[in-house]
């Protein structure tokens, strides 16, 4: 189990995430990814799902055609943890590498 991020460690971790924003009323972060089409969006989700399963850390997400809305939080920690930052960083890397555009 990852512990909840607090204080300076939290500020530092979140400062490194571009395009992610705090979810109103929750200790969570969110981002919308936009892809060329459904196949690219679903392929991205599949790659992320395989890693998320190995991490035992699963995103909350919704997909409509080329759009993917993602919310990350760690339920066991009752808020944001290193697992969320790790998964967000990986998602940004993969989305950027494949030439995807991200948009909030």
Curated annotation (Swiss-Prot):
<dbReference type="InterPro" id="IPR036428">
    <property type="entry name" value="PCD_sf"/>
</dbReference>
<dbReference type="GO" id="GO:0008124">
    <property type="term" value="F:4-alpha-hydroxytetrahydrobiopterin dehydratase activity"/>
</dbReference>
<dbReference type="InterPro" id="IPR001533">
    <property type="entry name" value="Pterin_deHydtase"/>
</dbReference>
<dbReference type="Pfam" id="PF01329">
    <property type="entry name" value="Pterin_4a"/>
</dbReference>
<comment type="similarity">
    <text>Belongs to the pterin-4-alpha-carbinolamine dehydratase family.</text>
</comment>
<protein>
    <recommendedName>
        <fullName>Putative pterin-4-alpha-carbinolamine dehydratase</fullName>
        <ecNumber>4.2.1.96</ecNumber>
    </recommendedName>
</protein>
<dbReference type="GO" id="GO:0006729">
    <property type="term" value="P:tetrahydrobiopterin biosynthetic process"/>
</dbReference>
<keyword id="KW-0456">Lyase</keyword>
